[in-house]
């Protein structure tokens, strides 16, 4: 798969650009700190992946024969970042061959149209029969090194070729011809009206589908395979290039395990971080109160990545020394979220006894945010300024203001929501998220954000 550099143009949905940081020298006796909030999460090009190996109605894994089908169910929204689109790919072996497989084109099948409507119905017309180029082709339905007749997996003469498509009615590199795709396989797509899809892969071949050199004919079984839901900037395979080990294992032997191993490390939810609010305050101020309802400012960050309300509200709170909105990524010219590798930085002043608090939205969620505990992070140990990586003090919180949906999929999450403050109200309280408290899985804070505090000057 090609490496993905995810676009993160979420500024339309995630707004807020005010700041009370004056840039003036620190007051007498105050220590200036530089604070960097960096996104250290990985960028994933694949949202979901897996294998299919058990025919519908069967109790054990196996190929599908005429009349049999596999089904694959998954959830996916229209995008994971603005401008991206979600696609589906799979691979299943044309078993009466040496190394042929059915799939969609390398960039996959679009799951949504340009208007964001889910695709449904028969999509067989978009399938392609590919030659993996890994084993020399023999007469289809008769070769001794083909899956039904070979002595074991990975037999046959290596070809050392590249992936190439075989269109209906066209011969392969060795001059052999194959049935039209619609005479062997039918693929249909169903959608539940929200985010759930079911792909059905049916074997529609018959005993007369594939003529053999002896004048007879055979059906074409289809093998277990692998699948992925991925963004449109990522290819499932590289046409014209050598096949990966995972594609080779399916195309030659109908074995999906190696492809699952290749897809696994590429699969996950990319987590951008939003503009946010930071404050320096005394020890008797709490940035938020766990177990209590979220303030409007915390809600605006947790749901929409908008820090303006919280920054403004803090101005009238006794014990707040300084409040700032961090909105513009380092190296950027305009406010925006930060994707993997991006960072925000700002400077604040503090005296011994002061604490630092901040909040930034965990964007692939409905109302989650990253922060220190409500009492904040002490900026001094006695009279000595804190210095270095303080990421181990960061927590993930649920604001309790909007019902949670599956991360990276929910239609009321930025960047998929229709606008700010959408989604069903929860009426809950702020809770720390650990593990799968809400039924969903989230990356640990240290896997997403790195917060570094650096004293400036003497």
How would you describe each model-predicted region?
Residues 1-8:
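Sec-dependent signal peptide recognition
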Residues 13-16:
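C-terminal motif of bacterial Sec signal peptides marking the signal peptidase cleavage site
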Residues 18-21:
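Bacterial signal peptide processing site
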Residues 26-120, 194-196, 205-374:
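Structured domain cores in non-transmembrane regions
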Residues 99-149, 367-416:
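An exposed acidic His-Trp-rich patch
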Residues 137-191, 404-458:
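Activation corresponds to long, low-complexity, non-globular regions
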């Amino acid at each position: 798969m090609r490496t993905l550099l995810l676009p993160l143009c979420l500024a339309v949905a995630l707004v807020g650009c005010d700041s009370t940081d004056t840039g003036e020298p620190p007051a007498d006796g105050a220590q200036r700190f530089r604070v960097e909030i960096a996104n250290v999460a990985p960028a994933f090009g694949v949202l979901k992946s897996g294998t299919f190996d058990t025919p519908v109605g069967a109790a054990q894994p196996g190929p599908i024969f005429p009349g049999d089908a596999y089904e694959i169910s998954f959830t996916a929204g229209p995008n994971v970042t603005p401008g991206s689109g979600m696609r589906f790919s799979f691979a299943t072996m044309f078993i009466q061959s040496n190394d042929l497989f059915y799939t969609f084109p390398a960039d996959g099948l679009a799951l949504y149209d340009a208007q964001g409507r889910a695709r449904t119905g028969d999509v067989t017309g978009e399938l392609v029969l590919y030659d993996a180029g890994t084993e020399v082709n023999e007469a289809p339905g008769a070769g001794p090194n083909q899956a039904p007749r070979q002595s074991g997996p990975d037999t046959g003469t290596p070809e050392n070729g590249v992936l190439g498509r075989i269109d209906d009615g066209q011969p392969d590199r060795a001059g052999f011809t194959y049935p039209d795709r619609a005479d062997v396989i039918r693929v249909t797509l169903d959608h539940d009206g929200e985010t759930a899809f079911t792909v059905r892969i049916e074997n529609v071949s018959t005993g007369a589908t594939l003529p053999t050199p002896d004048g007879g004919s055979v059906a074409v079984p289809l093998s277990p395979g692998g699948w992925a839901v991925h963004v449109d900037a990522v290819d499932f395979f590289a046409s014209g290039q050598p096949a990966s080990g995972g594609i080779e294992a399916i195309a030659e032997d109908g074995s999906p395990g190696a492809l699952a191993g290749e897809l696994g490390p590429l699969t996950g939810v990319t987590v951008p971080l939003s503009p946010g609010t930071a404050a320096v305050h005394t020890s008797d101020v709490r940035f938020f109160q766990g177990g209590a309802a979220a303030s409007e400012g915390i809600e605006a960050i947790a749901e929409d990545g908008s820090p303006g309300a919280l920054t403004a509200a803090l101005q009238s709170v006794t014990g707040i020394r300084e409040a700032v909105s961090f909105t513009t990524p380092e190296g950027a010219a305009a406010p925006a979220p930060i994707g993997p590798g991006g960072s925000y930085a700002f400077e604040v002043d503090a005296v011994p006894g002061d604490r630092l608090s901040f909040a930034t939205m965990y964007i692939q969620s409905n109302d989650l945010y990253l922060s220190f505990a409500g009492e904040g992070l002490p900026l001094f140990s006695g009279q000595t300024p804190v210095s270095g990586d303080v990421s181990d003090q960061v927590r993930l919180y649920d604001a309790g203001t909007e019902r949670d949906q599956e991360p990276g999929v929910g239609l009321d999450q930025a960047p998929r929501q229709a606008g700010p403050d959408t989604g069903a109200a929860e009426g809950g309280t702020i809770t720390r998220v650990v593990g799968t408290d809400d039924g969903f899985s989230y990356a640990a804070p240290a896997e997403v954000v790195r917060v570094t505090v650096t004293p400036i000057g003497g």
